[in-house]
């Protein structure tokens, strides 16, 4: 329910779940082999700063503006290397169409995440954890950043998102 958040916004995000500790110098195939699964979800972000007017350091004080993350679909990483390579390629090249109340808001793409892909965000997280090992999360979702801009959520809004690969179906989120 959006009412329990402060000026909530909607963001689609890819996530990974690590099953073993990776290192930042691994190839993409080795890195994804450390994951038990990946998936698509949505994050509700919020701002304690009225009108979403703040400076970058304020996001730390606002706990990264995180509200809640909801997993929409999760897929196990296959054991076959050819299938892993195919997933890596799709993670680097997907497009996502985001709609609100049947109106297209934006067409996002994988390269919107750190100007590269969700794997680049996962690798950046691993680099951070190599210096801050207490932050490493195993068996829990590691989100990779929004694929589109964040959009306002109001009561009774219906969002849908559709990817051209990875998960070939439309996901509906109702408020």
Residue ranges and their predicted role:
Residues 118-154:
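A conserved acidic, glycine/proline-rich C-terminal tail/linker
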């Amino acid at each position: 329910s959006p009412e329990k958040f402060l000026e909530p916004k909607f963001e689609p995000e890819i996530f990974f779940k690590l099953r073993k500790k990776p290192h930042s110098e691994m190839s993409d195939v080795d890195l994804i082999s450390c994951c038990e699964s990946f998936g698509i979800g949505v994050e509700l972000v919020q701002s304690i700063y009225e009108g979403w007017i703040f400076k970058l350091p304020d996001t730390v004080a606002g706990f990264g503006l995180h509200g809640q993350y909801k997993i929409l679909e999760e897929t196990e990483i296959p054991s076959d290397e050819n299938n892993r390579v195919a997933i890596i390629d799709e993670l680097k090249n997907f497009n996502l169409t985001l709609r609100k109340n049947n109106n297209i808001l934006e067409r996002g793409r994988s390269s919107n995440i750190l100007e590269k892909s969700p794997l680049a965000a996962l690798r950046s997280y691993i680099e951070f954890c190599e210096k801050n090992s207490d932050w490493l999360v195993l068996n829990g979702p590691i989100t990779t950043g929004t694929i589109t801009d964040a959009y306002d959520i109001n009561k009774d809004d219906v969002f849908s998102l559709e990817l051209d690969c990875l998960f070939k179906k439309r996901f509906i989120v109702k408020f």
